[in-house]
Design a protein with these regions (language model features):
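Conserved core of the PLP fold type I
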Residues: 52-73, 103-107
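PLP-dependent aminotransferase-class I/II
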Residues: 99-142, 146-154, 161
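Hydrophobic beta-strand scaffold residues
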Residues: 79, 102-103, 166-167
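Conserved N-terminal alpha-helix of the aminotransferase class I/II PLP-enzyme fold
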Residues: 13-60, 83-88, 94
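Glycine/small-residue-rich loop that forms an oxyanion/phosphate-binding "nest" at active or ligand-binding sites
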Residues: 87-91, 96-97, 103-106
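Short beta-strand/loop segments at the ligand-binding rim of alpha/beta enzyme cores
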Residues: 159-167
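Conserved PLP-anchoring active-site segment centered on the Schiff-base-forming lysine
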Residues: 71-89
Length: 167
């Protein structure tokens, strides 16, 4: 049986568990200042080809989403999500508490489509309404559906055409 409740409800891959077990009993300073975090940060810098990048780690999804969204949006901008999408119902109001609106659209599949985005954009056409700027998806969705590559490409295309971030 598959469960799409959240990523915290499932056990880690056996290789991850083995690596964690190898660290049992060792002490770390935490807050991203220990040797392991520094090592991983260096690996990330190498992977992205940015040796001077400033890498920080977050310990949960809500704080990650809140930090990212609050830093990429201006006060008059909003996030587009499906009704029942993760950011709509599982962030305990964190996004709204930052002053940003989550604009929701109905989707029986749990997925956003370019048509959904076009509809939201047409409903927010000028400076007198909140301006959509982030398109937020979860893959898999809250109901277990998974975006196909073609669907993701189509979302990327409409976001690029309209100056939206796909997150």
């Amino acid at each position: 049986m598959y469960s799409f409740t959240n990523d915290y409800n499932e056990i880690a891959h056996p290789n991850v568990m083995e690596a964690l077990n190898n660290l049992a009993g060792k002490r770390f300073t935490g807050y991203g200042t220990d040797g392991l975090c520094k090592q991983v940060a260096e690996q990330v810098k190498h992977r992205i080809g940015q040796p001077n990048a400033d890498i920080h780690f977050f310990n949960g999804g809500t704080i990650t989403n809140l930090t990212t969204i609050s830093h990429i949006l201006r006060p008059h901008q909003a996030v587009i999500s499906v009704v029942g999408g993760h950011i709509d119902v599982h962030e305990t109001g964190a996004i709204e508490a930052s002053g940003h609106k989550v604009i929701t659209v109905e989707s029986g599949s749990g997925k956003l489509t370019p048509a959904h985005i076009e509809k939201v954009l047409s409903e927010h056409p000028d400076e007198y309404s909140v301006q959509p700027k982030v398109v937020y998806i979860s893959n898999s969705t809250e109901i277990g559906t998974v975006y196909r590559k073609a669907e993701l490409v189509a979302l990327r295309k409409i976001c690029d055409e309209n100056g939206l971030f796909l997150f």
